[in-house]
A protein has these predicted regions:
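Bacterial N-terminal signal peptides that target proteins for export
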Residues: 2-11
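Generic detector of short alpha-helix boundary/capping microenvironments
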Residues: 11-12, 42, 151
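Hydrophobic alpha-helical transmembrane signal-anchor segments
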Residues: 16-19
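C-terminal motif of bacterial Sec signal peptides marking the signal peptidase cleavage site
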Residues: 21-23
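Bacterial lipoprotein signal-peptidase II cleavage site
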Residues: 25-29
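Short, Gly/Pro- and small/polar-rich lid/capping loops
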Residues: 31-42
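Carbohydrate-recognition beta-sandwich/jelly-roll modules
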Residues: 49-306
Length: 306
């Protein structure tokens, strides 16, 4: 895999979000550090971690929630939908694990099977250290021996999140994909609210719930890798021609722009999930590639190998 710099920038009337990810090259995969849980875990105090003329970034160390507020408009964008964060209700595990996770990850185990992680349910520890204009969080998934460091930095346009892949540690399980701030660009389920996805020249997904089933979207930026055999698609969608996504609104909204590394990215969205009560759109970055091959076993029967 070629070394890639992955950058995502989200622009809005109320706030802008910049997310930077760096993928590892194939030559450097062996140089990834082996997983070691540190003897002590640093924990930053809750409160303001950065501010400028326009924006303030806050960190809640108890609920592991990062949120940014606009001083002029009062608009708040949060890693956990802000109403849910303030409610303190965590009785539904499915809802809590989805909405309270600032990071999703997928890894491949020793048997070659993909497994999913979320920071709320699966992170044994989240180390938090204040840095210049922001905070560094390291997510330790001790059971599967994977750690992922992410730096969140406030800037004049909004917030950036960056992963230094040289800081990722692994054991026998291998990190495959990372999704940062999956509910930062989210809206309440309502027929008047919408998600913008870049299907073809662009499409809108209404965020209504109860009227129809949950709708999901997941498409690779610029289409599938031409080197791999195409898989059968059950939904008719157009290729993604522009690395963008967002939340439209009358007075404020979010526009996500992947400015580098878009060839590794997927745009994902979920609309109308009643248990979440929120609809969201975000980006996934795949740090490793995979392919599916059809082979024949000794009995001349077909078998699918990932």
């Amino acid at each position: 895999m070629k070394k890639r710099n992955i950058k995502l920038k989200c622009v809005s009337l109320a706030i802008a979000v910049c997310i930077f990810l760096t993928a590892c090259s194939k030559e450097k995969e062996s140089a990834l550090k082996m997983y070691i849980l540190p003897e002590s875990i640093s924990v930053a105090d809750s409160g303001i971690v950065a501010d400028n003329e326009r924006l303030v970034m806050n960190w809640d160390t108890d609920q592991h929630c990062l949120y940014v507020s606009d001083k002029q408009t009062g608009k708040i964008w949060s890693s956990t939908p802000f109403d849910y964060y303030k409610s303190g209700d965590r009785t539904n595990d499915y809802t809590a694990s989805g909405l309270c996770s600032s990071l999703y990850a997928t890894y491949v185990n020793s048997e070659g099977l993909e497994q999913e992680l979320n920071s709320y349910s699966d992170a044994s520890y989240i180390q938090s250290v204040k840095i210049k204009n922001g905070i560094k969080l390291t997510y330790f998934f001790d059971e599967v021996q994977i750690s992922i460091p992410v730096e969140y930095v406030l800037n004049s346009d909004g917030i950036s999140a960056s992963i230094d892949t040289s800081g990722i540690t692994e054991g026998k399980n291998k990190l495959y994909a990372v999704e940062i701030l999956p509910f930062f660009a989210s809206v309440k389920n309502d027929s008047e609210n919408m998600l913008f996805v870049p299907s073809g020249c662009g499409a809108l997904m209404r965020a209504d719930s109860g009227i129809r089933n949950v709708r999901t979207y997941s498409e690779p930026v610029y289409g599938e890798d031409a080197a791999f055999e195409k898989t059968y698609k059950t939904v008719n969608t157009e290729s993604v021609h522009m690395p963008v996504f967002g939340i439209p609104g009358d007075k404020s909204g979010v526009l996500g722009i992947i400015t580098s590394g878009e060839e590794t990215a997927y745009i994902k969205a979920t609309a109308g999930d009643e248990q979440y009560g929120n609809s969201a759109v975000w980006a996934q970055f795949r740090l490793r590639s995979k392919a599916i091959a059809l082979v024949k076993d000794i009995n001349n029967l077909n078998a699918t190998v990932g």
